[in-house]
Amino acid sequence: MQPKVRTAEIVKQFNLKIVTGEEGLHRPILTADLCRPGLVLAGYYAYYPAERLQILGKTELTFFNNLTYEEQLERANVLCTDETPGILITRGFDVPEAIVKAADETNVPLLTTKGHTTSVESQITNFLEAELAPTTAMHGVLVDIYGVGVFIKGASGVGKSETALELVKRGHRLVADDSVEIRQTGDGILVGTAPKLIQHLLEIRGIGIIDVMTLFGAGAVRSHKKISLVCNLEIWDQAKVYDRVGLDQETLQIIDTEIPFLTIPVRPGRNLAVIIEVAAMNYRLKNMGINTAEEFAGRLAQAIEDGNGGL
């Protein structure tokens, strides 16, 4: 299902004043793109993106006010369609009577703000991009470890929440437990958050549900985090060969983004929190251009080439 935002949400978010068209506040906004309809006001009606929120600033209104009333009414009627989610007048300018009349007849929300046009456009676009971003929900835990968003996944009961608790005790920050809502806010950018119902909560078998912020303080949690690394916990399988060098980098596709993926086998005696902590630090090192596995492979190849028997 395609995400959508109602015009009423824009009004509330940016404290906009409603001039007319309150009955149309339920209209959906399906794109983050906005429109400054200068060509429509000039009389060119082809390719008018009526489904976008329309922004009228100083340039558009100055031109519009120089038209005859009949021309104003004609072009205002083109602006106001059944699918237009709203028309926003910026900089606190007076709303032309022709636009008020057309918006009132078609129930198009006519809004005003005192903000500058460019600033308002930028803020609304950023808000819509976040709200309309492709979204999915995944089972797991998201923790901020040294600034790296690590998504811990695995079968139920494998120890994800317990590992997250140990990480929080070691000074890292919990974002979400059990269910992580993930939005793709841009190319290659995934941001995870917790559903409001379970925000800051951890479920520990044998204890129950605990409030991490209450127990460990506000510094132990955060509301959202970009996902940079996925660690999959699985019960150790003796028949399976696990990566012992780290040359091959697997990835996991979430929505349309490929994220570095590590499989961490679980068995008694392995400190998962420390292992995941080191995985996050190693990820940061790789981003800084330091790849220990590749350096080792290079040294090994050089030693073999030199016939070094001291291996």
UniProtKB/Swiss-Prot annotation:
Gene name of the record: hprK
Q: Where does Mg(2+) bind?
A: S161, E203
Return the protein name: HPr kinase/phosphorylase
Residues the record marks as active site: H139, K160, D178 (proton acceptor), R244
Give an example GO molecular function: phosphorelay sensor kinase activity
Q: Which organism is it from?
A: Exiguobacterium sibiricum (strain DSM 17290 / CCUG 55495 / CIP 109462 / JCM 13490 / 255-15)
Q: Name one Pfam family in it.
A: Hpr_kinase_C
Keywords attached to this entry:
ATP-binding, Carbohydrate metabolism, Kinase, Magnesium, Metal-binding, Multifunctional enzyme, Nucleotide-binding, Serine/threonine-protein kinase, Transferase
- Among its keywords, does the record have ATP-binding? yes
**Family that this chain belongs to:** Belongs to the HPrK/P family.
Reaction catalysed by this chain? [HPr protein]-L-serine + ATP = [HPr protein]-O-phospho-L-serine + ADP + H(+); [HPr protein]-O-phospho-L-serine + phosphate + H(+) = [HPr protein]-L-serine + diphosphate
List all membrane-crossing ranges: none
Q: Say what the protein does.
A: Catalyzes the ATP- as well as the pyrophosphate-dependent phosphorylation of a specific serine residue in HPr, a phosphocarrier protein of the phosphoenolpyruvate-dependent sugar phosphotransferase system (PTS). HprK/P also catalyzes the pyrophosphate-producing, inorganic phosphate-dependent dephosphorylation (phosphorolysis) of seryl-phosphorylated HPr (P-Ser-HPr).
Subunit-level organization: Homohexamer.
Residue ranges of the region described as Important for the catalytic mechanism of dephosphorylation: 265-270
